[in-house]
Regions:
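Phosphate-binding and adjacent anionic-ligand microenvironments
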Residues: 1-134, 139-169
Length: 169
């Protein structure tokens, strides 16, 4: 998406994934941790004036609550099963009152939730038979509320280990 935005003249020097992976325009948008560390070390070296790495993220807002649940897929063909779960979630979320599917998303299904002042992202892991579920909310108890609703949907899939969501109701 960052490449497309830049081609349209939108200044987009960095692409970030929910997992924390990042890619810089000046490194051809390669997901390169060594390059990122080199950039951070340069900033540390420049910090001789008393500034520090934390200053780079001053002003970024943090949600009141945030949680990641890592849901294991127990089916042998975990990739196809995960794709099915995401497809069904996309269909379900599009019809559910108070849920708004984020159209410009490239990592699974992201849904904004009215009332919880938050959102969730459910996606496939790139490497493991996992479906990470990230939830953020700006109201007390919002993560729990969103997780309970998502779990209600996921209960229909016998090929998911919903243990990480146990205790949510």
């Amino acid at each position: 998406e960052a490449k497309r935005l830049n081609s349209l003249g939108v200044d987009c020097p960095l692409a970030m994934e929910t997992s924390g992976h990042g890619a810089f325009r000046d490194n051809y948008f390669l997901d390169d941790g060594a390059y990122l560390i080199a950039k951070l070390l340069i900033e540390i070296a420049r910090g001789e004036d008393g500034s520090c790495l934390e200053n780079l993220i001053d002003g970024l807002e943090e949600p009141l609550e945030a949680k990641e649940f890592r849901i294991r897929i127990t089916e042998p063909d975990f990739s196809a099963y995960g794709d099915l779960v995401l497809k069904k979630m996309d269909e379900y979320a599009a019809e559910k009152s108070g849920w708004r599917v984020e159209a410009d998303n490239y990592e699974g299904v992201r849904v904004n939730i009215d009332g919880a002042e938050g959102w969730f992202l459910i996606r496939m892991s790139l490497h493991d038979p996992l479906i990470p579920l990230n939830i953020e909310s700006d109201v007390p108890g919002g993560v729990r509320m969103i997780a309970a609703e998502v779990m209600g949907f996921l209960n229909q899939f016998s090929g998911l280990d919903l243990g990480p969501l146990s205790g949510i109701s």
